[in-house]
């Protein structure tokens, strides 16, 4: 996970140094790990090591503090020559001894269309179907993307996926690309953001390279275009994309588009484009609910080979409810906090790591959350509580669950009754019964209060890093 910590450090550093400083000093550094709260960095030689200590140590410490490190430490290690060559692959290659000068007025040639072997060059290797967590918020979009990957140009063309930022639209698009590239290595795949498409078109017009530009985008088998809403108001780009769309569609080539809104809500989008975007399937992705957020965090931890207690993942999932990008960022912050402060993963550590970035909030409580916590406390199962059993060891947990759902959610009595397979009068009786019993039975009152705090994530935590 030191790679991820170093990536966040670099993001901080980049805002505080010049491009030349960044490229010269920071880009070649390689993170070697976190040992007893100290970030270990590999550098090329002793001169670089001394230079960092004299000129950039305070900047690095400030970057680590921004990640939650209370007593940040950085150690530098000179890499052996062989390891240096292995770990520093991004250094620029030496210039040819007799390279011919390039005239300044000559534009670089437009890259040719993808050829077999390089059809994933525009795809993010991290975005695949295997690591896409499916939940009620995205199951239709996932199913549609998988169908398109199985039968490109036939199932749904175009596939239009919309939703707020950070919910997985781009992930699904890249997943289709990887799936297709795996099955058909000869297929030509192109992923592009609308902004990049527009900028490349402008450059092509300026350099009289429109033919090459059109050949590039109209000769692909799969075109993935992100943030298509940014076509709005760009008449020349809309004109070009209209003809690109037609060329691909008429050749039965697959088109996948993403947006933050459905086609009908994209203002100043030409009607002919809007109608074409609606030819295939339009599907949306919503914010993930609690269980899906926990599953996403669990997958991220497993991929990073990090063992994090379930209760910590649950706390993060309750704290961050907006989108997946922020959810993953919160997990990274918790990991960095624990690693850099040399403390174990715990609810207290997670709460402290997130306290300065994600303000505590009353996360929305779901009926399934309540049911799961009550079942765990009473040593039974959600299915038994929702079942028809009349034994006391089932009836009491059932009534407690109904009471807490009524108290902690906005669900109506009929909705709660439907969830339990009963009518609203049964729920009303359960709420009244538990309310009455809590006034007479301190032990029951304490149990209900404990469950309430646990469900809301308000249990007392031990101090961390005090």
From Swiss-Prot:
Classification of source organism: Bacteria, Thermotogati, Deinococcota, Deinococci, Deinococcales
Keyword annotations of the record: ATP-binding, Cytoplasm, DNA replication, DNA-binding, Lipid-binding, Nucleotide-binding
This protein's domain notes: Domain I is involved in oligomerization and binding regulators, domain II is flexibile and of varying length in different bacteria, domain III forms the AAA+ region, while domain IV binds dsDNA.
Family of the protein in this entry: Belongs to the DnaA family.
Pfam family, one: Bac_DnaA
Biased composition (Low complexity): 97-108
Entry's localization field: Cytoplasm
Region annotation (Domain II) ranges: 77-121
UniProt: ATP binding residues: 166, 168-170
Ranges where the record places region Domain III, AAA+ region: 122-338
InterPro entries reported for this sequence: AAA+_ATPase, Chromosome_initiator_DnaA, Chromosome_initiator_DnaA-like, Chromosome_initiator_DnaA_CS, DnaA_C, DnaA_dom, DnaA_N_dom, DnaA_N_sf
UniProt KW Mitochondrion keyword: no
Annotated stretches, region: Disordered: 87-122
Organism, as annotated: Deinococcus radiodurans (strain ATCC 13939 / DSM 20539 / JCM 16871 / CCUG 27074 / LMG 4051 / NBRC 15346 / NCIMB 9279 / VKM B-1422 / R1)
The protein, known as: Chromosomal replication initiator protein DnaA
GO biological process entries: DNA replication; DNA replication initiation; regulation of DNA replication
Listed result of changing residue 202 to A: No strand separation in vitro, wild-type ATP binding
Cellular component GO terms, alphabetical: cytoplasm; plasma membrane
Subunit details: Oligomerizes as a right-handed, spiral filament on DNA at oriC.
Superkingdom, taxonomy of origin: Bacteria
Region (Domain IV, binds dsDNA): 339-466
Region (Domain I, interacts with DnaA modulators): 1-77
Role description: Plays an essential role in the initiation and regulation of chromosomal replication. ATP-DnaA binds to the origin of replication (oriC) to initiate formation of the DNA replication initiation complex once per cell cycle. Binds the DnaA box (a 9 base pair repeat at the origin) and separates the double-stranded (ds)DNA. Forms a right-handed helical filament on oriC DNA; dsDNA binds to the exterior of the filament while single-stranded (ss)DNA is stabiized in the filament's interior.
GO molecular function (one): DNA replication origin binding
Protein's UniProt keywords contain DNA-binding: yes
Main location class: cytoplasm
């Amino acid at each position: 996970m030191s790679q991820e910590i170093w990536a966040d450090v670099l993001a901080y550093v980049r805002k505080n140094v010049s491009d030349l400083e960044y490229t010269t000093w920071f880009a070649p550094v390689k993170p070697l790990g976190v040992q007893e709260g100290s970030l270990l960095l590999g550098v090329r030689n002793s001169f670089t090591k001394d230079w960092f200590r004299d000129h950039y140590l305070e900047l690095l410490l400030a970057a680590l503090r921004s990640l939650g490190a209370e007593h940040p430490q950085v150690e530098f290690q000179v890499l052996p020559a062989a390891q240096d060559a292995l770990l520093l692959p991004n250094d620029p290659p030496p210039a040819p001894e007799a390279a011919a000068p390039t005239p300044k007025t000559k534009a670089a040639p437009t890259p040719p269309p993808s050829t077999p072997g390089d059809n994933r060059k525009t795809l993010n290797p991290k975005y695949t179907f295997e690591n896409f967590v499916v939940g009620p918020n995205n199951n239709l979009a996932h199913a549609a993307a998988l169908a398109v990957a199985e039968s490109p140009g036939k199932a749904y063309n175009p596939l239009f996926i919309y939703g707020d930022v950070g919910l997985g639209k781009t992930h699904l698009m890249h997943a289709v690309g990887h799936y297709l590239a795996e099955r058909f290595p000869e297929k030509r795949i192109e992923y592009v953001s609308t902004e990049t498409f527009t900028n490349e078109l402008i450059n092509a017009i300026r350099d009289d390279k429109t033919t090459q530009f059109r050949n590039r985008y109209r000769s692909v088998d799969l075109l993935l275009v992100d943030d298509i809403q940014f076509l709005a108001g760009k008449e020349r780009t809309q004109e070009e994309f209209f003809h690109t769309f037609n060329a691909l569609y008429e050749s039965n080539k697959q088109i996948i588009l993403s947006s933050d809104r459905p086609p009908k809500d994209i203002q100043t989008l030409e009607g002919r484009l809007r109608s074409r975007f609606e030819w295939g399937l339009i599907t949306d992705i919503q914010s993930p609910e609690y269980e899906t957020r926990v599953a996403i965090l669990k997958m991220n931890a497993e991929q990073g080979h990090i063992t994090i207690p379930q209760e910590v993942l649950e706390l993060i999932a309750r704290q961050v409810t907006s989108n997946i990008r922020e959810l993953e960022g919160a997990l990274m912050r918790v990991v960095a906090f624990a690693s850099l402060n040399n403390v174990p993963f715990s609810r207290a550590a997670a709460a402290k790591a997130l306290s300065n970035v994600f303000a505590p909030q009353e996360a929305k409580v779901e009926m399934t959350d309540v049911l799961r916590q009550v079942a765990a406390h009473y040593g039974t199962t959600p299915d038994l509580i929702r079942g028809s059993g009349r034994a006391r060891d089932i009836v009491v947990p059932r009534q407690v669950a109904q009471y807490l759902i009524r108290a902690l959610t906005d669900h109506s009595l009929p909705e709660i009754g439907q969830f339990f397979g009963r009518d609203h009068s049964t729920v009303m009786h359960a709420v009244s019964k538990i309310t009455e019993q809590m006034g007479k039975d301190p032990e029951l009152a304490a149990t209900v209060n404990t469950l309430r705090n646990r469900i809301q994530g308000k249990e007392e935590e031990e101090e961390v890093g005090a």
